């Protein structure tokens, strides 16, 4: 689809990750679609999975947002249940309760007709808060009373937990793109991958059935 193509061209292309499958998630496609539909100026807003805020794979997403938007407001509501120990207790409640296990974030972004340097406004809601406490805080929040932190991203697309520049000088485990970079492993593989995940799920059983039938038909024509 054109949305998937745009994700590849503008977000996946800028990512330093080898496995870019997570960049084709629906919410990231929605970001890309919205920025394109805004045109020269406008506003977009989403409540989304927040893994893109600091995920290594999402560096291309952040670089794309930095490059194309003027003001970005990110309210990190935390709630990541895919953690353990004290980190899990810090993440605490998810605002979608049993309906969500990932970090939840609110993003509001402005694109101006005259390009200028992006300003990233970030707020972490805090540690050890229940879902009810988080929702109460959000209910009382306005742009004016939120204590925004201004983020100065680095050239690698890091917003939070920015990497040490010396990291780039370390040997890599492996590199398929260059023989000049010192690497520990010369040959390596991620194993067998179908790369057909997006065909295998949908909003209804009939939609999944239709997608799978199409996939099988097309596959047979190429045998």
Locate the predicted segments by residue.
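Sequence-level detector for compositionally biased, low-complexity segments
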Residues: 17, 33-223
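Amphipathic alpha-helical segments in well-structured domains
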Residues: 5, 27, 58-62
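Glycine-rich S-adenosyl-L-methionine
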Residues: 10-35
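Conserved small/polar residues in nucleotide/adenosyl-binding loops
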Residues: 3-11, 221-222
